[in-house]
Amino acid sequence: MTHLVKKTYLRSMKRRIKKVAVLGSGVMGSRIACHFANVGLEVILMDIVPKEANDKEKAKNLSIEDNAVRNRIVNDSLTFALKSNPSPIYKKTFAKKISTGNFTDDLDKIKDCDWIIEVIIENLDIKKSLFEKVEKARTPGTLITSNTSGIPIGLMTDGRSEDFKKHFCGTHFFNPPRYLPLLEIIPTKHTDPEVTAFFMDYGQRFLGKETVLCKDTPAFIANRVGVYSIMALFHIVEEMGLTVDEVDKLTGPIIGRPKSATFRTCDVVGLDTLVHVANGLKGAAPNDEKKETFVIPDYVSKMVENGWLGSKSNQGFYKKVKGEGGKSEILSLNLNTLEYEPKQKVKFATLEMTKPVDDLLKRLPMLIKGKDKAGEFYRKMFFSMLEYASNRIPEISDELYKIDDAVCAGFGYKLGPFATWDVLGVEATLNQMKAEGYSPAPWVEKMLASGSNSFYSSNAGSKTYYDIPSKSQVLIPGADQILDLDIIRESNTIWKNSGTTITNLGDGILNLEFHTKMNTIGGEVLAGINKAID
């Protein structure tokens, strides 16, 4: 859910985006360009000029003076992106919306662009040098943003004009941009509030994003909490002696997370990328009480040294090989020996016990109470995440719902930390955490003392959250403009059976939901349809 105030929403409609310049054509830049093309925008994608012609180009009598050579980097990057799987573009014909160029010859073309987004190497000096050139070419009033994930946004505009600073902020897309909905908006102290409001609205309405307003803190919101959780899990796995197969079984759909779970997700993201973010956090957040968690475990360091980075190197925590008869087989890494072994079936009593339970909200409390190794793992994993998230307020966000929104949209979780805590029971979980040596933020106890026993509630069909300064439940901004079926279902269900639910949306409108597997139509669904028509 994106949270917008009506007044802000209306003001932001004054500006229109028709053409975008994407500066940097790497993995993120090329895919961001594709997503802009997906929504019908004209895009110019640029990158640096190669130092010299390569052997293939020389064989064709091409030199560094030829456009084919000068635009080789950007053209190769775009071609690679368009061939990648999953595809970053809706239809191949949409790629015609993207033209290419280079910083040396074509930077003046940004004068016709409505939005300029920088997506180059994570080096502050190089970014500032590019922005100096951009300022000379851009039209005053043009929006300018950075997709950085690790450099403070406020440092990038040193030496830039007032107009540049006023129209500059961070716009952090998550990879792959077409598929992951999170877009973090990070204004600086100089950013015009209307620019911030515009991006919050534009990302939601035109780019299909979950826009989350962030403070300019290390790694912003989603990566700060999400990467911490992954790093904490790495250490828990080492401590408990769990296998790659076991962890991915425990941390996938069964707890409301993607099928890629933990280690497969790391392979997709790239272990080098994850290590880069973790090392960056360790240095950029020296006062973080959990900074030691960002220290890379030995088995991860050795994998990086070996070049086992995941999908990009064809092996990471998993490796695909040709088995007997030429059939492909997926091997998983033994974290102790660092040798690849056939995948093993995973069985835990706690998982067997919860197999019949389809409802995630009922399943999670059962999992965390497990008496076996799986239950112990869940307690360690969830308690560390809840502890860390609670202590990041107000550092990374003043409002707890922003942390949940960012983590869910950025990592594909069905429940963020605070929604998870509500499901587990706030007071009971808090007491258990303290008994096991965890130190959740003091404001959680104060919340319970104030009479609020949950982080979220509902009021007249709209979702509220616990506001720490006022010690009260407050309407989530924009919640009154959104129909939340989870809330409406609680009080406005007028009929249901095993396959359908009928709820009253007001204004003479009924909503009919299907609950059957794959939405198959059987007797229960037909009965629901007939009841709704009656």
Regions found by a protein language model. Name each.
Residues 3-4, 10-534:
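N-terminal glycine-rich phosphate-binding loop for ADP-containing cofactors
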